[in-house]
Regions:
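Transmembrane alpha-helices and adjacent helix-loop boundaries
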Residues: 109-111, 126-132, 213
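Membrane-cytosol interface at the C-terminal ends of specific transmembrane alpha-helices
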Residues: 142-208, 262
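Glycine-rich helix-loop "coupling/hinge" segments at transmembrane-helix boundaries
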Residues: 138, 213-250
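Alpha-helical membrane-interface segments at transmembrane helix boundaries
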Residues: 76-84, 117, 121-124, 206, ...
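N-terminal, non-cleaved signal-anchor transmembrane helix
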Residues: 1-91, 103, 107
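Transmembrane-helix boundary motif in ABC transporter permease subunits
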Residues: 88-121
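Generic hydrophobic transmembrane alpha-helix motif, especially the helices
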Residues: 121-155
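C-terminal transmembrane helix and the adjacent membrane-cytosol boundary/short C-terminal tail
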Residues: 203, 244-262
Length: 262
């Protein structure tokens, strides 16, 4: 009697499909990339195994936090200076990015305008706030103004992209209604688009403000205002109780802003 066709039930695994082969190749590529990255970072097994213990030792030395010493050094004022930097930077980003977003959205702007504005957003997002602050410090001098401008410029790229996506996701009905009444482009944006995107864009601004508070603390490390300069100073002298106080106050402020948000 002739043997029937061979099936997967014969005990042999089925031949790998194209999708399975691609997943296997992708997994192998990821393993190679991780190994290559670790080699480039000069990471050794001893350092990896010792990292948890070293981190715990530093964390333990931060307690109890030296709140009295931090208050004497004006850390509270520096923390709120970081908040002020973040607020001004977010305001700059919001005011500039929203009009540009109308020029970048594919459903309301022509390609000859849309493409350059989108590329502008991409270029801005490609430069970190830290680099922007280093570029601006020779112009503005050391202090919070450089930090606020750096955060503001970077926020334009991020908020502009988010607002563009919000505009492209609107209901086209109100736009058609305004156009049917003879309204021009500006009227369509004012009455057909803005009411739809404003709740979303407002929440994006608040979210970006939370991010900017954390970014402003980092900018202080290069002299761009905020609490970062005090944090670096205490780390250099290995005054970990004071470092703990600075970090605690910064975390409390960030959590308070997050709780107060929508």
């Amino acid at each position: 009697m002739a043997a029937g066709p061979t099936t997967a039930t014969d005990g042999r695994p089925p031949a790998p499909t194209g999708a399975a082969s691609r997943r296997l190749a992708l997994g192998a590529l990821l393993v190679v990339l991780v190994g290559w990255s670790l080699t480039g970072l000069d990471v050794t097994v001893d350092r990896l195994l010792g990292a948890p213990g070293d981190s715990w030792d530093i964390f333990r030395r931060m307690f109890p936090p030296a709140f009295a010493e931090a208050a004497e050094r004006g850390v509270v004022g520096k923390v709120f200076e970081s908040v002020h930097i973040a607020w001004i930077g977010t305001l700059i980003g919001a005011l500039v990015s929203l009009p540009l977003a109308f020029l970048a959205a594919g459903n309301v702007a022509p390609a000859w305008v849309r493409v350059p504005v989108r590329q502008l957003f991409n270029v801005i997002r490609a430069v970190p706030e830290l680099i922007l602050a280093m570029i601006l410090i020779p112009v503005t001098g050391l202090g919070p103004w450089a930090g606020a401008l750096a955060i503001g410029v970077h926020s334009i790229g991020t908020l502009g992209k988010w607002a563009t996506e919000a505009i492209e996701g609107i209901d086209e009905g109100p736009l058609e209604a305004v156009a049917a009444t003879g309204g021009r482009w500006a009227s369509s944006m004012r009455w057909g688009v803005l009411p739809q995107i404003l709740p979303v864009v407002t929440s994006q601004w608040l979210f970006r403000f939370e991010i900017n508070v954390r970014a402003s603390a980092v900018l202080g490390m290069i002299g761009a205002g905020g609490v970062g300069s005090e944090l670096v100073s205490q780390l250099v002298f290995r005054n970990f109780p004071a470092v703990g106080a600075v970090l605690f106050m910064t975390i409390v402020v960030v959590l308070s802003i997050d709780t107060a948000g929508p």
